[in-house]
C-alpha cells in the first residue's frame, strides 16, 4: 500500500481527518485478514473481558462468551504530515482502535504535537474546570489502543518534517445466531396498537 498508494481506495472522503493520505485496506487480503483475526479482534475481545469480567454475572448483559461475535467493519491507513490534524469525532460500530506504525522523532511528549486525545464529557460544559477533561496519548510505534466507538477523540497537528503513520479500524459486536434473545417477561402492551389509527380528512 505504501509503495503504490493510488492502488488502494482513498478513504478521506468518508473520514474526518485532514491528513495527507488515508487509504482503505482490503480485509480479504491474507495479511490483513491474519492481522485482523490474530491481533485486532483478539485485542477487542481482551478489552471486553477486562471490562465485563469485573461485573457480577447478572450485570454482564449480552457480553457472555459465545453470545456475540466480533466483525471488522473497515480498516485503513493514515499518513499525517506537518500541519495535518484530525478534528474531534466519533466512529460507527461498537469498538474502534488504532495501531501506531511510524512516528517522527519530534513527537516526543515535550508538547501535545501529534498526540491522540480522548475527550471527556466535561468538554461540552464550557464553565466547568478542565481537570480530567482530556487524556493525551503519546504515539509510539507498535502501541495499540482500543476504545468504544462512541468515545470522542482527535489527533493534534505536529511541526517539522517526517510522517506519522497509523492503522485505524472499526469493529461491530453482533449476537450469534445460536443464541437468540430470551423472551422478555411482563411485556407492556401499547394502547396505541389496540385502537384504530387516525383517519385522514
Model-derived segments and spans:
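Karyopherin-beta/Importin-beta family HEAT-repeat alpha-solenoid scaffold
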Residues: 154-156, 189
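Acidic, two-metal ion nucleic-acid-processing modules in DNA metabolism proteins
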Residues: 166
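Non-heme Fe(II)/2-oxoglutarate
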Residues: 1-65, 83-85, 188
Amino acid at each position: 500500500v505504501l509503495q503504490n498508494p493510488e492502488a488502494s481506495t482513498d478513504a478521506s472522503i468518508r473520514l474526518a481527518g485532514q491528513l495527507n493520505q488515508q487509504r482503505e485496506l482490503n480485509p480479504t487480503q491474507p495479511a490483513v485478514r491474519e492481522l485482523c483475526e490474530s491481533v485486532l479482534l483478539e485485542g477487542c475481545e481482551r478489552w471486553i473481558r477486562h471490562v465485563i469480567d469485573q461485573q457480577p454475572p447478572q450485570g454482564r448483559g449480552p457480553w457472555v462468551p459465545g453470545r456475540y461475535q466480533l466483525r471488522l467493519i473497515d480498516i485503513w491507513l493514515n499518513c499525517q504530515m506537518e500541519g495535518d490534524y484530525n478534528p474531534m469525532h466519533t466512529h460507527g460500530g461498537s469498538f474502534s482502535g488504532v495501531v501506531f506504525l511510524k512516528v517522527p522523532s519530534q513527537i516526543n511528549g515535550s508538547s501535545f504535537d501529534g498526540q491522540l486525545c480522548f475527550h471527556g464529557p466535561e468538554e461540552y460544559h464550557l464553565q466547568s474546570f478542565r481537570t480530567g477533561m482530556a487524556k493525551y496519548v503519546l504515539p509510539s510505534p507498535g502501541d495499540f489502543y482500543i476504545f468504544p466507538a462512541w468515545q470522542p477523540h482527535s489527533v493534534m497537528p505536529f511541526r517539522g518534517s517526517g510522517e506519522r503513520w497509523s492503522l485505524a479500524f472499526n469493529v461491530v459486536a453482533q449476537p450469534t445466531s445460536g443464541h437468540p434473545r430470551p423472551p422478555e417477561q411482563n411485556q407492556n402492551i401499547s394502547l396505541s396498537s389496540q385502537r384504530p389509527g387516525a383517519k385522514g380528512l
